[in-house]
């Protein structure tokens, strides 16, 4: 990628640093989309030994690019996002991706198709990490920031997507333990 094209792409991606998400950090700072994606990529890296048969570089790429559409639409929590919101985000993202030079445009287009269809183990792992990281972050945020429906959501979110992996099922159980401990402590 030429230097100017790289800078232009980074200027778009920088918007995610300002795009706040629904919850906060441990100290009450609003979480942003960039930090969510970064920690997802870190999770994938730390899981490399657990998934030796997978292309973990692909999973890390998926984690890094998965929310780029929110550069154009902002973050809408999953429990509020409508199909119209998803369609608008997909359209704006697709237009931007097509403006990138190859091989990035074609690589990202293929990755997004794979991610949307959950057509590979890598895509299933990325999606599991996406959901698990959100629950972990909620567990780390002050319970005073939780909405009433999140008490049950934190107990159940991502239990379906992790079923393909024994490791992820164990991780989800550990996260559930943290959720239940947090609720019991009221913090």
What role is predicted for each listed range?
Residues 1-187:
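Alpha-helical, largely C-terminal catalytic domains
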């Amino acid at each position: 990628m030429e230097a100017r094209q790289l800078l232009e792409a980074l200027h778009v991606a920088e918007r995610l640093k300002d795009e706040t998400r629904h919850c906060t950090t441990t100290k009450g700072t609003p979480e942003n989309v960039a930090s969510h994606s970064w920690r997802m990529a870190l999770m994938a890296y730390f899981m490399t030994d657990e998934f030796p048969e997978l292309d973990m570089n692909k999973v890390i790429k998926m984690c890094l690019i998965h929310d780029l559409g929110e550069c154009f639409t902002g973050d809408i929590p999953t429990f509020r996002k409508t199909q119209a919101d998803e369609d608008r985000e997909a359209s704006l993202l697709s237009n931007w991706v097509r403006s990138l030079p190859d091989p990035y445009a074609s690589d990202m287009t293929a990755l997004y198709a794979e991610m949307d269809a959950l057509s590979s183990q890598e895509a299933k792992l990325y999606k599991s990490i996406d959901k698990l990281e959100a629950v972990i972050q909620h567990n780390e945020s002050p319970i005073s920031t939780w909405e009433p429906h999140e008490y049950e959501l934190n107990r159940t979110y991502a239990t379906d997507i992790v079923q393909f992996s024994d490791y992820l099922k164990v991780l989800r159980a550990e996260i559930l333990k943290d959720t239940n401990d947090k609720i019991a402590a009221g913090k």
